[in-house]
Amino acid sequence: MSRPRRRGRDIHGVLLLDKPQGMSSNDVLQKVKRIYNANRAGHTGALDPLATGMLPICLGEATKFSQYLLDSDKRYRVIARLGQRTDTSDADGQIVQERPVTFSAGQLASALETFRGDIEQIPSMYSALKYQGKKLYEYARLGIEVPREARPITVYELLFIRHEGNELELEVHCSKGTYIRTIIDDLGEKLGCGAHVIYLRRLTVSKYPVERMVTLEHLQALAAQAEQQGVPAAQLLDPLLMPMDSPASDYPVVNLPLTSSVYFKNGNPVRTSGAPLNGLVRVTEGEDGKFIGMGEIDDEGRVAPRRLVVEHPA
């Protein structure tokens, strides 16, 4: 007879984790979920095991709004090893080609310029995108290459930091769906020498403050401190969380009076003054502006519910 599944606590918010190198995004997600004893958790766009940096982890009801972070732009610092191409486009892969590094400063500047702005990118075979129901990296591990369509991305900023020997350091501000490994691999081919990522750090996601990032070690230390002091771990851990609606912070706010919000929370569109003409909105209620979900302005100018916060009993 199987034991009943243990239910975690109803904690809602977003933790800005500084992901360590060498761990998968799912591994750190599970560790954070256990530390917080959360009933639900999800991340908002995986980082490769080699990569470090900002990984927003949504807990509880915040998982409903994680999609808005998946759609947001991001900034990275990357160091490439020139002269070597790998099968994964990073240092975790096998070297498949070595060539001399002979380009000039002018050739580098010209090559970098081709990656700025709106461009098309063919994703790496070593990615989590799916083809006929299977992830691309599953095919790649079997030595199978499948067709991939080029996808539109935007590189808002591509900053040259340094070029020393066979290392090239860049900073990239880009749209959703951008693979930094692929940019480096494509750049290496354009320069005629090959390249792969040896260091990758995600600096920012959307408008989240960098100073609110915390490490796994810090979380574990706080949990241990709470146990030593005989206080609930939540007392030390929960203040680290960003609000559950922070993934949707770019959307305008519509505040409903309590007389209208009850209908909205029951799934009905409502009319209210001050709403935009169209698009998605963050919906709050009452004088304290409590977040109750995401809405969308319908054809009649009403605020129609799209994703609602489920209120759990205390």
Swiss-Prot record:
UniProt-listed Enzyme Commission number(s): 5.4.99.25
Classification via Pfam families: TruB-C_2 (PF09157), TruB_C_2 (PF16198), TruB_N (PF01509)
GO molecular function: RNA binding; tRNA pseudouridine(55) synthase activity
Keywords in alphabetical order: Isomerase, tRNA processing
Catalysed reaction equations from the record: uridine(55) in tRNA = pseudouridine(55) in tRNA
Active site per UniProt: D48
Keyword DNA-binding: no
Binding-site residues for substrate, renumbered to this chain: H43, Y76, Y179, L200
Top-rank taxon: Bacteria
InterPro entries the record matches: PsdUridine_synth_cat_dom_sf (IPR020103), PsdUridine_synth_N (IPR002501), PUA-like_sf (IPR015947), PUA_sf (IPR036974), tRNA_psdUridine_synth_TruB (IPR014780), tRNA_sdUridine_synth_fam1_C (IPR015240), TruB_C (IPR032819)
Keyword match Magnesium: no
GO biological process: mRNA pseudouridine synthesis; tRNA pseudouridine synthesis
Classification via CDD domains: PseudoU_synth_EcTruB, PUA_TruB_bacterial
Entries under HAMAP family matching the protein: TruB_bact
Known role: Responsible for synthesis of pseudouridine from uracil-55 in the psi GC loop of transfer RNAs.
Family: Belongs to the pseudouridine synthase TruB family. Type 1 subfamily.
This protein's name: tRNA pseudouridine synthase B
Biological source species: Salmonella arizonae (strain ATCC BAA-731 / CDC346-86 / RSK2980)
